[in-house]
Each structure stands twice: as structure tokens, then as C-alpha cells.
């Protein structure tokens, strides 16, 4: 925060809630709300004097139903907004990120004020059509998966796993990157990549090229 204050970098501060594909809807149980209230009040008091702080959010990808972000009608979100207004009062508050009205990027018109996704390459021309046709006002999270560089992989993978592979065929790769396997994508784009230790560097470069 100090460095952001000094360098003019605006901060989007989320409270410590995230769906992560487990519990998309934030808890409204009284016991949880009491704990959340205490931590949220401490967080606002600690951060509110930083000039870099621009906006608060209830959390990451909180959804009432699939593809529909939580709104202020949720008791959890309503409580956090009240805390922000009472203890800060100068900053904007968004129920969650993305704030919708749709959660994920889409070519459908008029429903993409603030969206997330996608995180994988959608192919040519589909990927570029989707991004080009979306009329979102703010694409607040998106990305592309890729393998780590060869030097990094050698720091945590056992020798027997230091070769190109689909995630499903090696438990060590799977443990570290279950969602983000790119082997088949990269073979489709660049041609067959043999699963030999000598090709590890080639594989990571191809993977990162697609990410870029």
C-alpha cells in the first residue's frame, strides 16, 4: 500500500472471501457474519487512510447462482457495504468481482458491465471473436494458462517428471497445476512434442508463447 500511495497505483481491495469453485455463495450464517464483521471493520480502519485505495469489493467471484454475481440483497454483502459506508464513506463499494450482471465474458449484448474470463485459449478465430464482440465496460479478470519456465520446474518437480506431459499422465504435474495443462493445446498449435526430458524447454517456450 505504501508503494502504491507513492507511485499513484490504484488499489481494488477485496474482502477475504472467494468462491474458488467451492462455495460460490458467501455464507449468511450468523456465526460467520459476526467473525466477518470483526475482520472487515479492522481491515477498513487499517486501509482507509491510504490515498491509493479506490474501491472495496465483497470478494472474488461470489455468485448467487451460476454466472450471476451476488448483489446487495445478500446479507453478507449488505453487511460489508454498511461497514464501508460507516467507517470510510468516501470509497465505492462493489458487491463482488466480477459485479455483473453476468459473471463471465460473453458475446451477448447488454449484460457484461464487469466480467471475468476466459482463462484458456478458445481457438482461432473463436478466441478473438469472443473478446472482440463482447461489449463489457470492464474486463476485470482474464488470462491464459502456461507452463512455468524450465528453471522453475526443475526446482520442484522430481527428475522423473521433468518432461512434457498432459496433467492427467503425471501426478506431480497434476498436483501443482491441475487446471492449467496446455500440452494438447500446444501440440495442436506447434505440432507433436515428444515427451522426453530434452523437450522440456521447448514445451515451456511453446506454452508461454501461446500465453503471450
Name the predicted role of every residue range.
Residues 68-75, 98-137, 145-151:
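Substrate-binding cleft/loops of secretory-pathway carbohydrate-active enzymes
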Residues 22-26, 108-109, 151-154:
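Surface-exposed beta-strand edges and their flanking turn/coil or helix-capping segments
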Residues 1-104:
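Active-site mouth of glycoside hydrolases
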Residues 8, 74-76, 112-115, 156-164:
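Short, low-complexity, polar/charged sequence segments that are solvent-exposed and flexible
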Residues 56, 84-85, 120-212:
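Substrate-binding clefts and catalytic carboxylate motifs of secreted carbohydrate-active enzymes
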Amino acid at each position: 500500500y505504501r508503494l502504491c500511495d507513492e507511485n499513484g497505483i490504484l488499489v481494488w481491495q477485496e474482502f477475504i472471501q472467494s468462491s474458488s469453485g467451492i462455495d460460490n455463495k458467501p455464507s449468511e450464517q450468523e456465526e460467520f457474519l459476526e467473525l466477518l464483521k470483526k475482520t472487515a471493520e479492522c481491515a477498513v480502519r487499517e486501509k482507509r487512510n491510504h490515498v491509493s485505495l479506490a474501491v472495496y469489493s465483497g470478494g472474488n467471484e461470489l455468485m448467487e447462482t451460476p454466472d450471476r454475481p451476488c448483489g446487495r440483497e445478500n446479507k453478507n454483502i449488505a453487511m460489508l457495504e454498511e461497514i464501508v459506508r460507516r467507517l470510510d464513506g468516501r470509497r465505492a463499494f462493489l458487491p463482488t468481482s466480477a459485479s455483473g450482471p453476468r459473471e463471465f465474458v460473453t458475446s451477448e449484448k447488454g449484460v457484461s458491465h464487469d466480467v471475468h474470463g476466459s482463462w484458456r485459449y478458445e481457438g482461432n478465430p473463436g478466441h478473438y471473436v469472443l473478446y472482440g464482440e463482447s461489449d463489457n465496460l470492464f474486463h476485470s479478470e482474464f488470462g491464459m494458462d502456461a507452463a512455468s519456465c524450465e528453471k522453475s520446474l526443475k526446482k520442484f518437480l522430481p527428475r522423473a517428471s521433468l518432461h512434457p506431459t498432459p496433467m492427467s499422465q503425471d501426478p506431480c504435474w497434476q498436483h501443482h497445476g491441475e487446471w492449467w495443462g496446455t500440452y494438447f493445446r500446444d501440440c495442436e498449435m506447434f505440432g507433436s512434442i515428444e515427451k522426453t526430458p530434452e523437450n522440456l524447454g521447448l514445451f515451456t517456450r511453446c506454452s508461454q508463447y501461446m500465453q503471450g
